[in-house]
Amino acid sequence: MAKGFYISKTLGILGILLGVAAVCTIIALSVVYAQEKNRNAENSAIAPTLPGSTSATTSTTNPAIDESKPWNQYRLPKTLIPDSYQVTLRPYLTPNEQGLYIFKGSSTVRFTCNETTNVIIIHSKKLNYTNKGNHRVALRALGDTPAPNIDTTELVERTEYLVVHLQGSLVKGHQYEMDSEFQGELADDLAGFYRSEYMEGGNKKVVATTQMQAADARKSFPCFDEPAMKASFNITLIHPNNLTALSNMLPKDSRTLQEDPSWNVTEFHPTPKMSTYLLAYIVSEFKYVEAVSPNRVQIRIWARPSAIDEGHGDYALQVTGPILNFFAQHYNTAYPLEKSDQIALPDFNAGAMENWGLVTYRESALVFDPQSSSISNKERVVTVIAHELAHQWFGNLVTVDWWNDLWLNEGFASYVEFLGADYAEPTWNLKDLIVLNDVYRVMAVDALASSHPLSSPANEVNTPAQISELFDSITYSKGASVLRMLSSFLTEDLFKKGLSSYLHTFQYSNTIYLDLWEHLQQAVDSQTAIKLPASVSTIMDRWILQMGFPVITVNTSTGEIYQEHFLLDPTSKPTRPSDFNYLWIVPIPYLKNGKEDHYWLETEKNQSAEFQTSSNEWLLLNINVTGYYQVNYDENNWRKIQNQLQTDLSVIPVINRAQIIHDSFNLASAGKLSITLPLSNTLFLASETEYMPWEAALSSLNYFKLMFDRSEVYGPMKRYLKKQVTPLFAYFKIKTNNWLDRPPTLMEQYNEINAISTACSSGLEECRDLVVGLYSQWMNNSDNNPIHPNLRSTVYCNAIAFGGEEEWNFAWEQFRKATLVNEADKLRSALACSNEVWILNRYLSYTLNPDYIRKQDATSTIVSIANNVVGQTLVWDFVRSNWKKLFEDYGGGSFSFANLIQGVTRRFSSEFELQQLEQFKEDNSATGFGSGTRALEQALEKTKANIKWVKENKDVVLKWFTENS
């Protein structure tokens, strides 16, 4: 699944006035899942009463829970192994007499008895069953031995089970089939089998669609809903004959429903063995564009009819074939299915979902309008497609055994998405962006004592809520970062060789991460060119099984080098011990005298002449930031690097110019450097035109903005930024022919946006005139938007910030009329830029009205308001006053409480705010915090670190900005 949530990586770039993601700020992934919610509210909720349901035997369990009973444990017993399912579903896309949208279904599951048992335990959630005889299900044996009679059945809501108690025992090695009929609500909760709605031609349209990951297939039909319980699925959909039915496989048969010719019955080919969370089925009136790949795979891009008619699916179609071919070559394994459908949904909580053969997306992650979409929208489409298609092999064909190794699925896809996207767009240099988008972003979280390892013991991950918490930036971005490091020190060829062997060995089955290490080790052992200081497992377990990362410190006078666990607050203690004592085996590529070399740090400290320099030499470690660690030097080497940057910055690789800024700011935040050193590392920016160093600087300085934009420090800081960005603004003014054209490369186009955003926010009058003039032209002729799509986010935001009610109301009207989701997203974010308190308060009230703001967008909109210094207090008051209602309304649906808590607390830096946060935790302990539980602990830790940092650095920072502005 793509990162959420969560927030598009590239959309974040366009919203710099509100703040580029701070390196020292906790950021959850954008793209978060519909399941990433607290399940307690769901577990206590009663399934909707639906017409035709019949009562059965006991429906609830005794409040006194006997944990020894298998149905009171969250993990399935190993007694039964599913073989296949026959599932028929009929969604009703108009409400019934009670005003509910429902679906009806029937299911037959065939399973083998693996251990003798007298109870059948299968997942079921919010389903009402129609009795078969006296019980919810019917059971029969395949073979001569009859099945035992059913004694009773019960629904255990806490563990989400349908439990069938038998009068006798199932026989080990024998097969059985169990039938059921059921009804469920086709709710708008973005989970399981749900409905999505949109307007077209003034009419409301309803789509029946799915989101099963991580634990919501059970909400659609009774199933063994764990990733290792792979089976073949035979799906049949009954649907109105004017609509199209899709599923993981191609249709096998389509016929008219005999009893009602206005309905069709579409039966699909059986799937290969696969996990329940990868199932998908959709009923809609969407249209498609199609192509056939060179490997004869049918490719279709589905979306709302108007979007397809206007060509908004063409770009996705253009890049899908090349990306599929790239991964087939990269994995040395053919694409496993005959077709690849990708569909853009109006309501979808995650960024996308890798359902096998039927990938679902948010509209903004799949549709692209060349006339209205920006270059960042285009980059988002190609990278998210690459992420999801990478999963078709790594995750779908071979699947982790349990969610504790989710990082292997998502981290791998988050790494190779850059490779696949780079293949589709070779001129964009996308592979470098992983440093900004993943490595540096996740280090902000992983530097906290409350972080967690990539892989957890399986017994620590049991409940749906615990599973949901794993869908975070550690899983995605740290996973990507350490796998990239592994590929780098092995070489890409060896990495691919081991990967191919792994996929061929475990196809259609499940693995743990150690299986990958074993196959990579086999690749290493098959050659002699690459020599490692230890086995792959010995090296990598230190990066997987302990949280955090090291800072590598080198003294260029003595050649001494040592490592230590980097913590943002060096006085804090890790929340869990490490078997490796927080030491790593560290690969260190370095640059000295213009030559690159490589070194392994295998112990806590060492000494080497390789790291000694003469008076006119400087040393640079972690070339191109392939390693997942930060680097510190003696002060003399730092000064040499600064002199080099201000003399001839081109000698230092672009990525390392960004690294110098990023690492030094983080080291200063942790008290390992004087804060003036990283500030001095930004002086060269007056001569810098490349995107990555500027982005690293703005991200780092955004932390200063968050800490000081309510204090006297902010004035001198703005003056310094204005001084530094003025040459960049002038550079792009010339390069773009006075803003009429766009720079030729992706990175330059991104830095043009940085130049305008920073110039406007720091008070450059020429920038203000530019954005106000462009926005006024649009207001005077709303049918003709003169603002280039690349610049719209920053122009909209700044014009609304400089303006008043009239500018805001115009943007709101355009947002309400927007038919392209990318344009709507830009406007929705910009509406939070107002400096009028009453306008922001009104906008805040809109966010919880689904008629104004879709549920999937509520969190990001509220966080956008909180990012605005004027709106931050409003949001905090709103959240505290309404937490219980927020939790009740969104706790089991689309609301990402982790994003919300992180977004509203990122400015907290006073004792008073810490007290408020602690009181908030105490006041709402009974209600709970859902997927925000870990985020709340991180917010408390971060607030304490902020308080300490501000006390220690405020006066020094004020003095430095005053002297240098």
UniProtKB/Swiss-Prot annotation:
Binds 1 zinc ion per subunit. One of its GO terms (cellular component) is cytoplasm. Residues 69-965 are annotated as: Metalloprotease. Residues 33-965 are extracellular. It is a single-pass type II membrane protein. Widely distributed throughout the CNS. Particularly abundant in kidney and intestinal microvilli, also detected in lung and liver. Weakly expressed in heart and aorta. Zn(2+) binds at residues 387, 391, 410. SUPFAM superfamilies: Leukotriene A4 hydrolase N-terminal domain, Metalloproteases ('zincins'), catalytic domain. Disulfide bonds join 760-767, 797-833. GO terms for molecular function: alanyl aminopeptidase activity; aminopeptidase activity; metalloaminopeptidase activity; metallopeptidase activity; peptide binding; zinc ion binding. Sulfated. InterPro entries: Aminopeptidase_N-like_N, Aminopeptidase_N-like_N_sf, ERAP1-like_C_dom, M1_APN-typ, Peptidase_M1, Peptidase_M1_aminopeptidases, Peptidase_M1_dom, Peptidase_M4/M1_CTD_sf. Residues 44-68 are annotated as: Disordered. The chain crosses the membrane at residues 9-32. This is Aminopeptidase N. It comes from Rattus norvegicus (Rat). The gene is Anpep.
